[in-house]
Amino acid sequence: MPEHPRHCDFQRGNVEIGLGPGGDLLGKRLSCPCITSHCSSEKKARSKDPQATSLLPELESTMAPEDHYHQLMSALSEASSFEETQRLYHLGIPSHDLLRVRQEVATATLRGPSGLEVHLPSSTADHRRKQGLVQRREGAVPAAATSFSEREMSQPPPLLSPQNAAHITMSSHLRPPFLGMPTAVCQTPGFSFLPSAQAEMLARQQELLRKQSLARLEMSELLRQKELGSVHRPLLPAPEVALHIPEGPDELQRRGSMLVLKHSSAPLLALPPQGPPGPGPPIPPKESARSRSEKGSLGVQPSQPKETTGAGLWAQEVSEEPSKDSDGEDPETAAAREGTSTPSQVPAGGTRAEGRGLLSGSTLPPPLPLGFPCGAVSPYFHTGTMGGLFTDEETTTLEDVNKWTVDDVCNFVGGLSGCGEYARVFGEQGIDGETLPLLTEEHLLNTMGLKLGPALKIRAQVAKRLGRVFYMASFPVALPLQPPSLQAPELSPGHQPLSPATTTSPYEGTHLPTGQASPKQENGSGTIALLSGAPDPSQLLQ
């Protein structure tokens, strides 16, 4: 045993473990209460003792490698005060060298006990060199560390924290002053402080991930909207189709004719060349026209309304009509069918087309507002055999309602079923033939106090006697057919009027100016041609 057994007890209280000169940094020695101020003299005496050098072989032979490793780990893991650690870093000790030395200690511990050296405590590095310790790591010890005692030097924080440990990024004004190194860690297990460079890199990665997720969400939303649009698109009309506004009179006329055809009235199409399918054999176009002219000249008319009725029911579509009607017809008739004739050509050169019940393209009526149906299925219109635009013997004969007196109007209303009680109201209001066509549903219901059924019946009967399909379209002023001052047109030889009543009808006039309307009574059937001229306000509702 050595002379000073009190100082040779290999306990944690007075044992210093180190690796060569690095013991200044790696050695851990806690103060013992029994050590007094004469410790330095005892250390000097003990260092000069030749038996002190024999301690190393004994220690190495008596201590197992596991004991060396446990003592080393316990010395490294002992925490020190914050002030001592802060002073250690303020000395300017490089953190990289410090970590390198600690890693070498761990490597030497794993290799074997020969790498560990246990020596007695001494006050200076010169005494440790005299004890024969290994000097190969002398350059790694900073020069500034030799001026302080081992008591003032404390163990730095443990090794680097694992990669999966929680990191705390703090700003510079919240960090401890010694955490400026790129690899500095916190002493608290499980947490560590990220340096500024690593914190910025982590923030950039998080921002990039956030932007990628947002872009992915936006793309998925766009794809979903596109799929929904493709699913619901066939159910909705295109905006340009739904909000299309007709441009020009030609477009208005085309839309008007298509509207009439769509609602099953077809008043604008003539008899097809091959004739309608029926009980009788079909008649060729030229022969049928010639036979009709002969029948009109002889006054034989009973069978013709049936043919015109068939023309209204078996009218062709607009797309098929020009191609089928162009065969076997002269250019004049074809031009009249295609609507290329002008208003000046209608009275003179368009007699054949008008005789067949066709209106030229320039004389098509404008479309009804809001697509109001004016077909044969509508109960508000007197369609007759040709949709109300054409008159024949099956329809009510046109009467001069304008010449009716108040008594005539009262008799007319009293003669209708369910309207007899309202004849007195018409007499009190002074309704005569001129004002009767001007009455609207609002006048009849609100002003005169009629019920809805009688009011509609009166308007339907007035429209039937006027022969105007637009009378029941809720217009306060019906579309005028011709001014009252006009004389009956001159009839061509071989043509006769429908009945004696039509000779005294309001269709009086010699020659029509352009833009007015005139009835064409030809081949035993009356045809009303509507021209595109604006009516005179003084010539309304005849």
Swiss-Prot record:
The keyword Cell membrane does not apply. Expressed in the outer nuclear layer of rod photoreceptors in the retina (at protein level). Predominantly expressed in retinal photoreceptors and pineal gland. It is found in: Nucleus. Residues 268-364, 486-542 are annotated as: Disordered. Residues 273-285 have a biased composition (Pro residues). Residues 499-526 have a biased composition (Polar residues). The modification Phosphothreonine is found at residue 342. It holds the Pfam family SAM_1. GO terms for biological process: negative regulation of transcription by RNA polymerase II; retinal rod cell development. GO terms for cellular component: nucleus; PRC1 complex. Its main location: nucleus. Disruption phenotype: Double Samd7 and Samd11 knockout mice show shortened and disorganized photoreceptor outer segments, reduced light sensitivity and delayed signal transmission from rods to rod bipolar cells at low flash luminescence. Show an up-regulation and down-regulation of cone and rod genes, respectively in the retina. GO terms for molecular function: DNA-binding transcription repressor activity, RNA polymerase II-specific; identical protein binding; PH domain binding; SAM domain binding. InterPro entries: PcG_chromatin_remod_factors (IPR050548), SAM (IPR001660), SAM/pointed_sf (IPR013761). Keywords: Nucleus, Phosphoprotein, Repressor, Transcription, Transcription regulation. The keyword Transcription applies. The modification Phosphoserine is found at residue 499. Residues 404-469 form the SAM domain. Component of a Polycomb group (PcG) multiprotein PRC1-like complex, essential for establishing rod photoreceptor cell identity and function by silencing nonrod gene expression in developing rod photoreceptor cells. Self-associates. Component of a Polycomb group (PcG) multiprotein PRC1-like complex. Interacts with SAMD7 and PHC2. This is Sterile alpha motif domain-containing protein 11. It comes from Mus musculus. The lineage of its organism: Eukaryota, Metazoa, Chordata, Craniata, Vertebrata.
